[in-house]
């Protein structure tokens, strides 16, 4: 099977790169092992919330020079501030073309509410999320935090209590919703995605509206767990119209409706453009030459995927894009050079809340995001997203930005080579 580009990994980075290439007529295939980090995400996208020294960032573009000084191996530093600034509007436009409704812009971080009622700096938030610092932020002065009876993945009392400490007159209550009684009988099935599949049905809408209107009498907004709007945020806006007040969603424990919705929108866009996705498959090895890369997958061992270019978007330890052994960290498909601490004692810190060194382990790349094998740069192979070295997506608040920007950066490199 022959393609222009083979992408290993079907998460945020892989899909974004594939969409951009497919928009320009490239024939792309994505080998996706299964669930990715989007299934566990809040649906919000961060760009840069903190520098490595802990300094908070409000205007990410203004912080790129200092980031390069503190973290020269950070993917943004590798790409360069000028490239990052040029790509950011393109990222936002690509997401809009993919029919993804987001609030925010790259000039200024805003704040999104976490599942515990606290606020975290953010670049782009779901249109039905709870935000602060945007013209469209509207979670009210006395919101109702509406939980769901028996649903343990969202604690409305904790959220309301946290908001009260911030001077917001929030209160909590729980929806009974008899339509969910069958799900309640099996706690392992009483999860956000399964609830959303029921609440998104038109025949269940009136019961939801009726109960919410009773609970929220006297409240100026409703904040509830993201247990509806699996396929589209329009369901949430229709509910808000019926109630006459804003209805906003907070992410729950995984699997995340907001993250799944983002993944579905990107996957649909890629397929609409003619892209091929091989779900449930896994790249196991590859052979390289200067003219072609052949990728062998678990289900197609004897029939490799051949392409002039390959893009590794396999993620970090979470998705086995990086693998640890007792004394080293490896990249299992290509055997890329990986930067990691030589002494295993330096891989982590005892304090679980402290920045963990292993989070910054990853593939060594140049400014074009070409990786190395045994010290030699491979010019028709690229690495993007969480497999890259030099950044901590949690502490620095830059995981989504690295995935999106590195994906477009590499797509542009491939397109330039095809159109000199």
Swiss-Prot record:
InterPro entries: FAD-dep_OxRdtase_2_FAD-bd, FAD/NAD-bd_sf, G3P_DH_GlpB_su. Keywords: Flavoprotein, FMN, Oxidoreductase. Its EC number is 1.1.5.3. Coiled coil: none annotated. Pathway: Polyol metabolism; glycerol degradation via glycerol kinase pathway; glycerone phosphate from sn-glycerol 3-phosphate (anaerobic route): step 1/1. Pfam families: FAD_binding_2. Its cofactor is FMN. GO terms for biological process: glycerol catabolic process. It is an enzyme of class 1 (oxidoreductase). One of its GO terms (cellular component) is glycerol-3-phosphate dehydrogenase (FAD) complex. Belongs to the anaerobic G-3-P dehydrogenase subunit B family. Conversion of glycerol 3-phosphate to dihydroxyacetone. Uses fumarate or nitrate as electron acceptor. Composed of a catalytic GlpA/B dimer and of membrane bound GlpC. This is Anaerobic glycerol-3-phosphate dehydrogenase subunit B. The gene is glpB.
